[in-house]
Structure formats: C-alpha cells, structure tokens
Amino acid sequence: MDYATFVAKAIAQDERNKFEPCSGNIDIVPDELKPFYRDYNPVDVELSVNGVGIKLCPADELSELQKEYNYINAQFIFATCNGDPIFVNNGCVYTCAHGTQEPQYEKKAESFNEYLQALVDLTC
C-alpha cells in the first residue's frame, strides 16, 4: 500500500484532514501499522465512506482508545465509525458494535494495508 496515495485521497476528500510524521513514542502500535504512524500520523483525519464517518486515531490518543474499548478484547484499535471500534486482531481488520456485552467481530479486511486500500477505492 502506498500510504502517500491514501493521504492524498483523504486530503482531497476534505482539506481539513491532517497528517504529519510522528516524532513521539509509537511502541504501542503493532509492527504492521508502525510505518503508517511513523510517516503519516493521522493528527486530525475523518473520512466519509458511503455517508458514514471513519475517524482515524492519532498516535498520541491510541493508548486512551485501547482503554476505552478494552471490553472487546481486540488486539489494537486504530479508528472508530460512529462509535464502533475498528481494530487489528491477528493481522486482520475488524469492527464490532460498541457497548454490547458479547461483541461480534465483523471482518473488514485481511490486513491494515488492504483496509486502507479499500478506503482509497471507496473515496474515489
């Protein structure tokens, strides 16, 4: 996945979307997401996909996001959609309804890169 293409599409959709390299600690971020967060930290990014907002979480808020959604037992949450977490679990990207006693994972992509590519394709 060419992250620059994703960033360009996000900014083309809404010029207020802001990315910048992350100079802080990203140890919490899984290895497969580190290149994206290191080079294109989503400081303030919300995408509209089919009329639904997807908010990518900036690096400095990731720790709090994990705590907020700890009840779903996901490996790593990196975004939300109308309050529903979007997360990486065993390499795949999933979502589930927030606030439920027994969350049912819904697979969105086979990998983080595939998920970003799908967002690029859907925001054309």
Please provide the spans of the model-predicted regions:
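Short glycine-enriched loop/turn motifs at secondary-structure junctions
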Residues: S48, T100-Q101
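Short, compact, well-ordered microdomains
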Residues: G83-P85, N89-T100
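Compact, glycine/acidic-enriched structural inserts
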Residues: E102-T123
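A surface-exposed partner-binding patch
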Residues: M1-V88, T123
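Short, highly charged low-complexity linear segments
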Residues: S63-L65, C92-C96, A118
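Structured catalytic/translocation cores of nucleotide/phosphate-coupled proteins
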Residues: C96-A97, L122-C124
